[in-house]
C-alpha cells in the first residue's frame, strides 16, 4: 500500500483498471488459457520443423479462433475455413487480371476491401469478411516475381488451415470445454454470492460487474441451446432458471440483513430461504431441473414481507413448481443483415474511410520503398470501428500490445537469442511469453486484444520467415513504426472524415433504457406466474441496456473532436441518468413486496403515474428537453388505505425521480425542489 500511495493518482487508477480487467474470473477461462498456450507452442514446433512461413499469421488464427467453449471454437473454425477459401480466391483473381498493372490492381482490390468492410459491419457473419479484408492485402505489392507470389499465396492456405485444424483437435475433440459445464458453474457461483449477501452484511459489488455477469449468463444460454440436446428439450425451465438466478443475484447484491429487525421468525425464514437456494445449487450442479414442495406459511409470508424478501421467495418457489417439460416459446430467427444496411449511409462511409486510410498507407510505404512498415495497412483494417470512440479504444489497445511485443522482442533478441542452440530451448523460452499473452487475451473483452497484438508483434519481429537464430533489430523497428503510422493515419481519417459520433446516439440509448424501465412499472405487482416471468425478462434487458449505455459513455469520453465542455456535460448527465435508473429499478423492486396487498384496480393507476412520468422524461432526452419529473401521489380512499411501508417506498421512488438531471439547464445542477409527495 505504501508503494501505491507514492504513485500519482492517474497511475494508481490505471493499475486498478488493469487489475480489474486481467483478474476476471469466469468459467472456462483457465482451460482456454491452457489450450491457447499449448496451441502456440505446437504452432512454433510445427512451423519450425516443416519451415512453414508466416508463423505470426498462424498464431493470430489461434488467438482469434480458440474460444471459451467447444461449440464456439468449432463455429469459428468453420468461419475460418470459409474465409480462407474466399480470401485465396479473391487474391488469385487480383493476380490473374492485374499483377503487372498496379493501378488496375488497386481498382480491383479497393472494391473487394470496401465490400468486406461493409459486410463486416452489416452481416451477422462479419468475422468472415474481416478475415478476408485483413489477409494478404500487401502481398502483390511486396514481391516482383509472379511465381513466388503464387507460392506464398498457396502457403497462406496452409498457414491458415493447419492452425484451424489444430485448434479443432485441441478445443473440440481432445479437450472440449462444454458450455453446459460452464453454465452450471456460473449459476452456482452467482448463487454463492447471493447466499453470502443474504446471510452476511457485505459491501455491494459494482453494478457494472452485476450487469456483465447477467449478460454472461445470457450468452452461455445461447451456446447451451445450440450445443446441448437436453438443454434444448427443457429450455423453458432452464431459461426461467437463468432469469431467476440473475434476479436473486442482482437483488441480494444490495441487501443488508442488518437493516431489518432480527426477530426469531425472520432469522428462521432467512435460513429456510438459504436452504432452498442451496437445494437449487445442488440440482444445477448435477444438471437436474430443481423441484420444490415448499409452500410459504402465513408466518413465513409475514417474515418475508418484513425483511423485504417476499418477491425473491415467490420467484424462487415458482421456479421450483414449474414443469420441466414446459414447451419453449419459439425463438424468432434474427435477420442476416441489419435492418438499415442499404438505407443508412454510415455503413458505406465506414467502408470508404477504411479504404482511404489503407490507400494513404499503401501510397506512403510504396513511395518511400519501405516494405517493412506494411503493417500500417493491416492496422487501418484492424482499428476500423463503427464510431470514433471505439476506434480510439482499438488504437490504444493495438499500440499498447505492439509496444509490449516490441519490447519483449528486443529483449529476446539481445539477451536470449545468442544463447539458444535447439528448438527445445526455444520452446522453453517462448513458453512464458505465450502464457502471458494467452492470459491477457482471455481477460475482459475491453483489454483482451492487447494479448493478441503483443504475441503477433513479437512473432513478426523474431520468428517470421526465419528458422534459426536471428539478430536483425530492423524488423522490430519497422513493425512498430508501421503500426504507429497506421494508427496515426486512421485517427486522422476517422476524426475528420465523416466522424461517427455517438454523442447524439447516447441520449436515444438512455431513452430506450428508461422506456424499458417504464414497462417494468406497468407490469401488475402481483405474485402471478406470467407477470413475474415478464418482469424477470425485462429486468435482464435492463441490465443489458444500462451496461450498453455505460460503455457508450466511455466511448463518447474519447471523442476529442467534440467541444470539451459539452462532452463533459453530456457524460455527467448520462452517468447520472444511468445511476438513477439503476437505483429506481432496485427501489421499484422493493415496492413489489407490499403492493400486492392493494386492490387490483387501484394498483395500475398508482404505478401508471410513475411510468407516465418516466416515459415523458425519456421522450425529451433526444431533444434535450427533459426536466426532473415531479410526481404527486394521489390520495387513496380510506377503504383502500395504502400500507405505510409501501407509501414510504413509493416516496423514495419519487425522490429518485426528482434527482434525474434537468437537460434544459446550461449546467448540471442538483435538483433544488423536492418531489411532491416525497419525504426526506
From Swiss-Prot:
Membrane topology: Multi-pass membrane protein
Organism: Shigella flexneri
Domain of life, source organism: Bacteria
Keyword tRNA-binding: no
Protein's UniProt keywords contain Cell membrane: yes
Entry function: Could be involved in resistance to puromycin, acriflavine and tetraphenylarsonium chloride.
One annotated Gene Ontology cellular component of this protein: plasma membrane
Family, as annotated: Belongs to the MdtO family.
Keywords tagged on the record: Antibiotic resistance, Cell inner membrane, Cell membrane, Membrane, Transmembrane, Transmembrane helix, Transport
Assembly: Could be part of a tripartite efflux system composed of MdtN, MdtO and MdtP.
Alphabetized Pfam families for the sequence: FUSC
Localization: Cell inner membrane
Molecular function GO terms recorded: transmembrane transporter activity
One of the GO BP terms on file: response to antibiotic
Membrane-traversing stretches: 43-63, 75-95, 100-120, 125-145, 155-175, 399-419, 423-443, 454-474, 480-500
Protein name according to UniProt: Multidrug resistance protein MdtO
Amino acid at each position: 500500500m505504501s508503494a501505491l500511495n507514492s504513485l500519482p493518482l492517474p497511475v494508481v487508477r490505471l493499475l486498478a483498471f488493469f487489475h480489474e480487467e486481467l483478474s476476471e474470473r469466469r468459467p472456462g477461462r483457465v482451460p482456454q488459457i491452457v489450450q491457447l498456450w499449448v496451441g502456440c507452442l505446437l504452432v512454433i514446433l510445427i512451423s519450425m520443423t516443416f519451415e512453414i512461413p508466416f508463423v505470426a499469421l498462424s498464431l493470430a488464427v489461434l488467438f482469434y479462433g480458440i474460444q471459451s467453449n467447444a461449440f464456439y471454437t468449432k463455429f469459428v473454425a468453420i468461419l475460418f475455413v470459409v474465409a480462407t477459401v474466399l480470401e485465396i480466391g479473391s487474391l488469385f483473381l487480383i493476380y490473374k487480371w492485374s499483377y503487372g498493372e498496379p493501378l488496375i490492381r488497386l481498382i480491383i482490390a479497393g472494391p473487394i476491401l470496401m465490400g468486406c468492410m461493409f459486410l463486416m459491419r452489416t452481416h451477422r457473419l462479419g468475422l468472415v469478411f474481416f478475415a478476408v479484408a485483413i489477409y494478404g492485402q500487401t502481398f502483390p505489392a511486396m514481391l516482383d516475381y509472379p511465381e513466388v507470389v503464387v507460392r506464398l499465396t498457396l502457403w497462406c492456405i496452409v498457414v491458415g488451415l493447419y492452425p484451424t485444424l489444430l485448434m479443432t483437435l485441441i478445443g473440440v475433440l481432445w479437450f472440449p470445454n462444454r458450455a453446459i459445464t460452464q453454465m452450471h458453474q456460473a449459476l452456482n457461483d452467482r448463487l454463492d454470492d447471493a447466499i453470502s449477501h443474504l446471510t452476511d452484511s457485505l459491501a455491494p459489488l459494482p453494478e457494472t460487474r452485476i450487469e456483465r455477469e447477467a449478460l454472461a449468463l445470457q450468452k452461455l444460454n445461447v451456446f447451451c441451446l445450440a450445443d446441448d440436446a437436453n438443454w434444448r428439450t427443457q429450455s423453458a425451465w432452464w431459461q426461467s432458471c437463468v432469469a431467476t438466478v440473475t434476479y436473486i443475484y442482482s437483488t441480494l447484491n444490495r441487501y443488508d440483513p442488518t437493516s431489518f429487525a432480527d426477530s426469531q421468525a425472520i432469522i428462521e425464514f432467512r435460513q429456510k430461504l438459504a436452504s432452498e437456494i442451496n437445494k437449487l445449487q445442488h440440482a444445477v450442479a448435477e444438471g437436474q431441473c430443481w423441484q420444490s414442495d415448499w409452500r410459504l406459511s402465513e408466518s413465513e409470508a409475514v417474515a418475508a414481507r418484513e425483511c423485504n424478501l417476499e418477491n425473491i421467495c415467490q420467484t424462487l418457489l415458482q421456479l421450483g413448481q414449474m414443469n420441466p417439460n414446459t414447451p419453449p416459446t419459439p425463438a424468432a430467427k434474427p435477420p442476416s443483415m441489419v435492418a438499415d444496411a442499404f438505407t443508412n449511409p454510415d455503413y458505406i462511409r465506414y467502408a470508404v474511410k477504411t479504404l482511404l486510410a489503407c490507400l494513404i498507407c499503401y501510397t506512403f510505404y510504396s513511395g518511400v520503398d519501405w516494405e517493412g512498415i506494411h503493417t500500417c495497412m493491416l492496422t487501418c483494417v484492424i482499428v476500423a470501428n463503427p464510431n470514433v470512440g471505439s476506434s480510439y479504444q482499438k488504437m490504444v489497445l493495438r499500440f499498447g500490445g505492439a509496444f509490449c511485443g516490441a519490447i519483449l522482442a528486443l529483449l529476446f533478441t539481445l539477451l536470449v537469442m545468442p544463447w539458444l542452440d535447439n528448438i527445445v530451448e526455444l520452446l522453453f523460452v517462448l513458453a512464458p511469453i505465450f502464457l502471458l499473452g494467452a492470459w491477457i487475451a482471455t481477460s475482459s473483452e475491453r483489454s483482451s486484444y492487447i494479448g493478441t497484438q503483443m504475441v503477433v508483434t513479437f512473432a513478426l519481429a523474431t520468428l517470421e520467415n526465419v528458422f534459426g537464430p536471428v539478430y536483425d533489430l530492423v524488423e522490430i523497428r519497422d513493425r512498430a513504426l508501421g503500426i504507429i503510422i497506421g494508427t496515426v493515419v486512421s485517427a486522422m481519417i476517422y476524426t475528420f472524415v465523416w466522424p461517427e459520433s455517438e454523442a447524439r446516439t447516447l441520449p436515444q440509448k438512455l431513452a430506450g433504457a428508461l422506456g424499458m424501465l417504464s414497462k417494468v412499472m406497468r407490469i401488475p405487482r402481483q405474485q402471478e406466474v406470467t407477470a413475474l416471468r415478464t418482469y424477470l425478462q425485462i429486468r435482464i434487458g435492463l441490465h443489458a441496456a444500462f451496461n450498453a449505455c455505460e460503455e457508450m459513455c466511455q466511448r463518447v469520453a474519447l471523442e476529442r473532436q467534440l467541444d470539451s465542455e459539452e462532452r463533459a456535460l453530456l457524460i455527467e448527465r448520462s452517468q447520472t441518468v444511468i445511476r438513477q435508473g439503476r437505483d429506481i429499478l432496485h427501489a421499484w423492486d422493493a415496492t413489489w413486496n407490499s403492493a400486492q396487498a392493494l386492490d387490483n384496480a387501484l394498483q395500475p393507476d398508482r404505478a401508471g403515474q410513475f411510468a407516465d412520468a418516466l416515459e415523458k422524461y425519456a421522450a425529451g432526452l433526444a431533444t434535450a428537453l427533459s426536466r426532473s419529473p415531479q410526481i404527486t401521489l394521489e390520495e387513496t380512499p380510506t377503504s383502500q388505505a395504502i400500507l405505510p411501508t409501501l407509501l414510504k417506498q413509493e416516496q423514495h421512488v419519487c425522490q429518485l425521480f426528482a434527482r434525474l438531471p434537468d437537460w434544459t439547464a446550461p449546467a448540471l445542477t442538483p435538483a433544488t425542489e423536492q418531489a411532491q409527495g416525497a419525504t426526506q
